[in-house]
Structure formats: C-alpha cells, structure tokens
Amino acid sequence: MSDTLATSFRVLNYSGMLFNKGNTRCPLSSIIGGRAKTTNHVEFVTGQEYTTGGGEQPAISETASLTAPEASVITRTQKTNVTQIFMEAVGISYAKQSNMGTLSGLNVANQQANPINELDFQVAAKMQKVNRDIEFTFIQGTFNKATSDATINKTRGLVEAITTNTKAMSSKPLGLWDIADMVKKIYGANAPTDGLCLWCDATTLFQVNADAVQNGLTVVPAAREINGIALSSVVTPIGVVYLYLGECLPAGTALLLNLNAVSYTHLTLPTTSR
C-alpha cells in the first residue's frame, strides 16, 4: 500500500478550535502507568504458580512416625506474556508544511490556521491512536508468540488471561450478589480480596446501580482515587469492591481486577543516531 501524505490540497488548513470526535479515553493505562516495568527480552515472565495442600489433619501413629514418609514434591508452572510492536507513520510534504498560512472554509479577519504546524498535529493525532490501541490490547489482546521474523508477537490481554474464577451470566443483568459471588470465588482460590475493582461498561454499571437501588443499598461515588481516576464502591460480605466505567471491554463482559497486581511491561528502546 502506498503512503498517503499530507499535501496542500489533500489536507486543508482551517481556523477554529479543534475537536477530536474519536474515543481517546485510556483509564486502565492511566491507573497502571506508574508501575511500568522494563525488559530487554520480547517475552517476559508474569509469575510462577504452585499449589500446596488445602489443609487437612494428618493421621500418623507413633509407630509410623519412626519411618520417614514417602517423598513428594511441589511442581511449579511459569506464566509468560510477550511485548508487541505499536507503530504508526506520518508524511507531510515540504510544500504543505510551509503553506500553513493558506486558509480554506470560513475566514474571519486576523484568524490563523489551527493547527499552526501540520507535522506536530499529525504526530499528536497518531499518538492518540497508539494510546487507544494499547488500551484495547491491554483488555482484549489475543496472545501469539512469534516463531520467525515474519510472524507476529501479540500481547495477551486481561480477558484472555483470566481463565479461572469466571462467572457466566447467560445474558442476565449483573447485580450486587453476583459481584459478591465473584469475590467469594477469588477468596476460595486463596487470592487477595483487598482493593478489587469491577471494570465494566456503561450497561453493566447501570445494572449494578439499579440493583443497588432496588435492594436499598448504596453505591458510594468517588470512594477512592488512583492517578486521578475516581472509583465508586460497593460493600460485599467479604469486602469492598470498587467500580469503574472502563473502556474497550467486549459487550457483556466485566472484569474483577486487583489493580495493585496489574502493570505493563515495555522494551527499552535503543538510542539511534543519524
């Protein structure tokens, strides 16, 4: 596919305030941005998992205790993910870049082109797109590990990464007791239940609020703030769950996240010289 370049007659200059009609919200990136990790390897470790006993009462007689029990071991499983490439390009002709004073559309005396620099505008707009692509990948990314230079590394997102402690709602509205049941599942899996956050879309958020009203319960607004993101909260029998209107979620899907355990990893880019 050939490049599409910004030229004088393809990208016209206008005066007036700029408004982006696209969706640029990236709340998950904002919340976890302060915990970024770096790596020098395209594949990185997210952790190891192992399981010890669930708790039982041993039955060992004095006679049996004189002989060592049969040996056994605890095995471990390593979990990994991969980094992937996000890349955009812009092209502006020298003639276009030097022709920002020629205005199209309605012109009022003493107005000037907005933006005043085409290259700066194009780069900033592409960065907004990349940020949104990263947010989408954090949520809905489908894992693929490259096996050659011609194949693609694709980061595993949260939806795909969560394979246990799931609940199928069968198209039913999500209510407070459903949230409580998910917290119970997490507790039953021996995972921390402090600071859990329900990352949901607008429909699910409305369902939770409606259920709270019908049952005489309260959703506490702005109960907590992380990196400028205000989270509401509800109380379950096991603990407080925060609520947030997330982005890039598949329809009918909500995520119950421990935001303190979520971070992103990026490769350290080498410096280049020309």
Model-derived segments and spans:
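Flexible, glycine/threonine- and acidic-rich loop/arm segments that mediate assembly and lattice contacts
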Residues: M1-Y242, E247-P250, N260-L267, S273-R274
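Short, surface-exposed linear segments at secondary-structure transitions and domain or protein termini
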Residues: T253-L255
